[in-house]
Amino acid sequence: METSSSMSVETTRSVQVDEWQKNYCVVTSSICTPKQKADAYRALLLHIQYAYANSEISQVFATNLFKRYTEKYSAIIDSDNVVTGLNNYAESIFALAGSRQADSNKWQSGLSIDNVFKMSCVQEMMQAGKKFEESLLEPADASVVLCKEPTAFEVPQLSVCGGSEDADILSSSGHDTDKTQAIPGSSLRCSPFQSARLPKETNTTKTCLTSSTSLGESATAAFHMTPLFGNTEKDTQSFPKTSTGLNMFLSNLSCVPSGCENPQERKAFNDSDIIDILSNPTLNKAPSKTEDRGRREDNSLPTFKTAKEQLWVDQKKKGHQSQHTSKSSNGVMKKSLGAGRSRGIFGKFVPPVSNKQDGSEQHAKKHKSSRAGSAEPAHLTDDCLKNVEPRMVELIMNEIMDHGPPVHWDDIAGVEFAKATIKEIVVWPMMRPDIFTGLRGPPKGILLFGPPGTGKTLIGKCIASQSGATFFSISASSLTSKWVGEGEKMVRALFAVARCQQPAVIFIDEIDSLLSQRGDGEHESSRRIKTEFLVQLDGATTSSEDRILVVGATNRPQEIDEAARRRLVKRLYIPLPEASARKQIVGNLMSKEQCCLSDEETDLVVQQSDGFSGADMTQLCREASLGPIRSLHAADIATISPDQVRPIAYIDFENAFKTVRPTVSPKDLELYENWNETFGCGK
């Protein structure tokens, strides 16, 4: 049995040696890809951990090997060079920062004017248009006023534009003196080609809704529409709704010359089409019924616009939206449900259930906007915030920006090395940017890691206070949202406001929850937020002159992503307070209370509190301060004066030690020290 076990051990070792040699050859080879080298480095790190777990190598040797291969692995992962690195965030960064145009001038469309004319449906429409034009000349169809004032509805016409350079594109709408006048939308005509009329009504089952007309009025007629595409409707359908549909249909048709197969030329032509449509106010009106019955709600519908047209309107007519809205709406629209509700771009949404709190909510919004007053335009006039939503700027100003009291370096006990390093690389460069330029400039990010309760948050506030910078305190929950894309917008808004408030310090508490390592099971929204944060911190669009410092604090540094660790240049270990720091904490807290501790008793308290963090020392002093209160009888608490309460004594600390325990275990301290030796920048 012993022989078989020894043989199996030897076999396992030989396999491990073969794997080690194979991976080592991969990382030293010049023909392997960076991806293969990264996989080989990960395999080597696993071999090192396996050998150390089986006590095959010593701790010092394992630490040195792990540090060496981790640095080489990080160099491949974070390298921007395509030949020697993976550039792990390149695709996401290029997708966000790239603003190249998708259309090319050399692209040709497969759809031409000749192909359109050969389509059977277009041929049917042209034939139906000719029949309709002939039916208008029959006197029995309807009483039509010729060469008079405009009628209540007009004949729809559709002109197909052809390819002549001298063609009059988008000419103004003219009146046909031989027939009835054309409705809005028929102004889109081109002269070189014969007009192709829309199909008109061929059956006149209902005739002549005539009435006694006075001066300035004209007769109206209702016709029965014959559908072209097989859709049958009831005979009782009224003509105003049908004409409204035709009006909305015609307003979206555009004439394209034959030489406009190029997408960019076609886009320019469509933009000129939109200009003509928006400049003619009659295109937004639908024909009405008789004036004695008033205006119908359907006739006040604004003209429907596609997403491209609406985007053009927002870009070209910014600042005149209110005037455009008042011109496009005729009368007051009723709040109704169903098909009669306005569905245009200026229509207001009407919920199916009436909300009784609308009045109070509107009053609250008006009160809030009036209370903000002149403070809102102050931070919206900056060029950095022109593309940021005002509500996000207000949220950052009110909730994320910290307005607490200033913090001094003397308020932080111990951690002298961390304080000296921060003064050297952060505070002084922000105070004197004229001296600290070039390589002396401040870093983009700092990571403060260590056990909880050691003053990492206090150090972040002190950096902002002593450097005169604006302090932003955020967490992972303040950047997440249930709506898609809101988290990325909040990150962009945060850095935009920080650029306007330079110098600025962005403190992220528990940064491991925001910039954790990526995995296969990670949600897409958190990945996008993480990518946007890294791009804003150090990406293609960032400027080296920005004085924005990101300070991250965590007690789980091993869970931070490799790319985030690379951007957080200075990684400082904040250990547990030493004996002198614990004595300073006790002295500062007891100076505000009545205390009769001697120096020897204070030293005993400091000696017994070995392994306590700063938060543990505060809890110990708080528990000891309750000792004099507990010594009183319950009946005396209601009548005793504050001066009659005895001072805090050493016996109170002895009782406090029985209930207060250190919150950091030796195993956790060993983990922090090992991570500091591998990735830390301190002693």
Curated annotation (Swiss-Prot):
It is an enzyme of class 3 (hydrolase). Its cofactor is Mg(2+). InterPro entries: AAA+_ATPase, AAA_lid_3, ATPase_AAA_core, ATPase_AAA_CS, FIGNL1_ATPase, MT-severing_AAA_ATPase, P-loop_NTPase, Spast_Vps4_C. Gene3D superfamilies: 1.10.8.60, P-loop containing nucleotide triphosphate hydrolases. Residues 288-299 have a biased composition (Basic and acidic residues). Its main location: nucleus. One of its GO terms (biological process) is male meiotic nuclear division. The modification N6-acetyllysine is found at residue 348. Keywords: Acetylation, ATP-binding, Cytoplasm, Hydrolase, Magnesium, Metal-binding, Nucleotide-binding, Nucleus. Its EC number is 3.6.4.-. Hexamer. Interacts (via N-terminal one-half region) with RAD51; the interaction is direct. Interacts (via N-terminal one-half region) with SPIDR (via the C-terminal region); the interaction is direct. Interacts with FIRRM; may regulate homologous recombination. Belongs to the AAA ATPase family. This is Fidgetin-like protein 1. It comes from Mus musculus.
